[in-house]
């Protein structure tokens, strides 16, 4: 069981009423708290929880409509996402209890200060390298809309400026990261047809490619509902259309692709996790047509080239700079 869940279960009497678990891990916590429901935005966690606790977890970027007497927020990595979630919860919990649990290395001590606008926060427990904080909501805020927290920015491309709409919690929120910038300089001569933007984030790559190659059918895929919500806003801001899918890794992608384009993630929360990218590299061949291309950008220190050659085909470095490399391989 996740150590954050174990910390909650050290004081189970606090969590016996109608409870909303927000950003909960895919463990057995719901089985221990029969009156609790979950709210999740990670497609992989959602699938795992649905398989065990069908009908007890809501998925998406907005708080569920069902009433709850208390809520526990599992601290996310991004401070701005924490602010959005705390606001969404506190606005519904006037006079009631709001809890925050997280790992010490994830910044729980500092994040606890984000409870102070709602009332006097206090630390209830510290164990398993985690902390549990609580506040009685004395100052319930007005709920803010997610879109009001978006950070739009523009990037200059060969065919003109592209507007990107970035939501809280999305990778490289409010700015273009160096890896994507390098890949955007190298989206020439992509195969025509069906293209997948894997790990689409705010939709920078997918939108840029759709505008440059308008006859291509573009699918944008991410495991995170905040990312796919951002991608839809980015497409709309530029008058573009593409299919946006929230799904768990390459298994959620269509078959018969001509191109897979990616700036793949290797972090989940505060943890390093290469599984999604390694799974992409191992299974890309199944999703690509013969002659289809995998083109991705990665940090120099990530040794993806041997894995690509083993599972896709001959791989070469198309470009490099600022600590990143672009790998290109065509399915033989």
Swiss-Prot record:
GO terms for cellular component: cytoplasm. The keyword Nucleus does not apply. Keywords: Cytoplasm, Methyltransferase, rRNA processing, S-adenosyl-L-methionine, Transferase. One of its GO terms (molecular function) is 16S rRNA (guanine(1207)-N(2))-methyltransferase activity. Its EC number is 2.1.1.172. InterPro entries: Mtase_sm_N, rRNA_ssu_MeTfrase_C, RsmC/RlmG, SAM-dependent_MTases_sf, Small_mtfrase_dom. HAMAP family: 16SrRNA_methyltr_C. Belongs to the methyltransferase superfamily. RsmC family. This is Ribosomal RNA small subunit methyltransferase C.
């Amino acid at each position: 069981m996740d150590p954050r869940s174990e910390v909650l279960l050290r004081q189970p009497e606090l969590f016996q009423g109608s409870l909303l678990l927000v950003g909960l891990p895919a463990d057995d916590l719901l089985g221990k708290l029969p009156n609790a429901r979950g709210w999740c935005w990670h497609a992989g966690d959602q699938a795992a929880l649905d398989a065990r606790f069908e009908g007890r977890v809501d998925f998406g970027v907005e708080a569920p409509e069902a009433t709850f007497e208390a809520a526990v927020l599992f601290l996310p990595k991004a401070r701005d996402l924490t602010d959005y979630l705390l606001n969404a919860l506190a606005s519904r919990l006037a006079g009631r209890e709001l809890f925050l649990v997280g790992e010490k290395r994830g910044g729980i001590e500092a994040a606890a200060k984000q409870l102070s606008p709602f009332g006097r926060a206090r630390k209830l427990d510290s164990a398993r390298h985690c902390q549990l904080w609580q506040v009685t909501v004395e100052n319930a805020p007005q709920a803010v809309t997610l879109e009001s927290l978006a950070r739009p920015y523009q990037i200059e491309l060969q065919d003109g400026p592209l507007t990107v709409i970035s939501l809280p919690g999305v990778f490289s929120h409010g700015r273009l990261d160096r890896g994507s910038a390098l890949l955007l300089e190298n989206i020439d001569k992509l195969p025509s047809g069906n293209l997948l933007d894997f790990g689409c984030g705010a939709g920078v790559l997918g939108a840029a490619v759709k505008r440059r190659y308008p006859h291509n059918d573009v699918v944008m895929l991410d495991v995170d509902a905040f990312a796919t919500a951002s991608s839809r806003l980015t497409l709309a801001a530029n008058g573009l259309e593409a299919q946006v899918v929230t799904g768990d890794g390459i298994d959620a992608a269509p078959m018969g692709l001509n191109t897979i384009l990616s700036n793949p993630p290797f972090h989940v929360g505060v943890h390093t996790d290469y599984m999604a990218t390694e799974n992409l590299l191992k299974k890309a061949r199944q999703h690509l047509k013969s002659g289809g291309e995998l083109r991705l950008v990665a940090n120099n220190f990530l040794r993806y080239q041997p894995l690509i050659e083993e599972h896709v085909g001959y791989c070469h470095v198309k470009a490099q700079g600022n600590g990143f490399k672009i790998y290109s391989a065509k399915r033989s």
